Design a protein with these regions (language model features):
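Structural motif
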Residues: 39, 99-101
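Generic internal hydrophobic packing segments that stabilize the cores of diverse globular domains
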Residues: 77-81, 98, 110
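Short, acidic loop-beta-alpha module within alpha/beta folds
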Residues: 34-52
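Short, basic/hydrophobic alpha-helical segments
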Residues: 76-92
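C-terminal accessory helical subdomains adjacent to catalytic cores in phosphodiester-
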Residues: 1-34, 52-67, 88-97, 104-233
Length: 233
């Protein structure tokens, strides 16, 4: 496509901003918004996905900031804390929900990062082994530990079987992946698959929970922010 990947992310944010502005003009007296901060390990793959998700499921009670910082696990948690502080101070506001998005990769401090995030009150949309596991679960249940490259093969095979996608090749940071998953995959099934995977583990050694993901939890919150409002004064 003609745009660079950075321009594509900017375009998604600009379009979402226009939609929010239009909704804002229509509803001056709308109810309080739930403010989300999502800080991702990756600078393209995860931010593109969540920006597209937010744009595709507009809500008058949700405000979302998505950041991609290029660092993982404990370093990501520390950076998230700094980003949260800076944005809240700059904009004179507070985030209601903070989420971190990261993969297991080869990080030895994976469990520590999850614990640290929990202690800070952050949600962790972690994946073991990689974020692309969430994509795979849109097409099939997967409970066998496989290499990251095998996730890619699964995604490509699933989409190549769909009309008009015979030559599909997956690339990290593909800004079109959310649309393809919505068109050809089954998000509700993916959520059920993710929950089933979690129930198959009965300990808190998350580094050994392979495959497993918490991405569906964040997706669900973004799609239903009104649930948070019902639990707060």
């Amino acid at each position: 496509m003609g745009h660079s990947k950075n321009n594509e992310l900017a375009r998604l944010r600009q379009e979402r901003g226009k939609s929010k502005a239009t909704n804002g003009r229509k509803e001056k007296g709308r109810q309080r918004q739930v403010r989300f901060l999502i800080v991702c390990e990756g600078t393209k793959t995860e931010p593109y996905y969540f920006e597209a998700l937010v744009q595709g499921s507009m809500s008058d009670v949700r405000e979302v900031n998505v950041e991609g910082v290029g660092m993982g696990t404990v370093a990501l948690i520390k950076e998230t804390k700094a980003i949260k502080h800076d944005l809240e101070k700059k904009n004179n506001m507070q985030f209601d929900r903070v989420w971190v998005v990261f993969d297991k990769d080869g990080f030895q401090d994976f469990n520590q990062a999850i614990t640290m995030a929990k202690d800070l009150g952050y949600g962790s949309a972690w994946s073991n082994e990689a974020f692309e596991l969430w994509y795979c679960l849109h097409f099939a249940y997967l409970n066998t530990a496989i290499k990251r490259s095998a996730y890619i093969t699964m995604i490509e095979n699933a989409l190549k079987n769909k009309p008009g996608n015979n030559n599909f090749t997956y690339t990290k940071g593909d800004p079109d992946i959310y649309r393809l998953l919505q068109k050809y995959g089954d998000e509700n099934m993916a959520k059920k698959h993710a929950e089933k995977l979690r129930k198959s583990f009965n300990n808190t050694n998350y580094a050994a929970h392979n495959p497993c993901t918490m991405v569906d939890k964040l997706v669900d919150e973004l799609q239903h922010p009104e649930r948070f409002l019902r639990t707060t004064p």
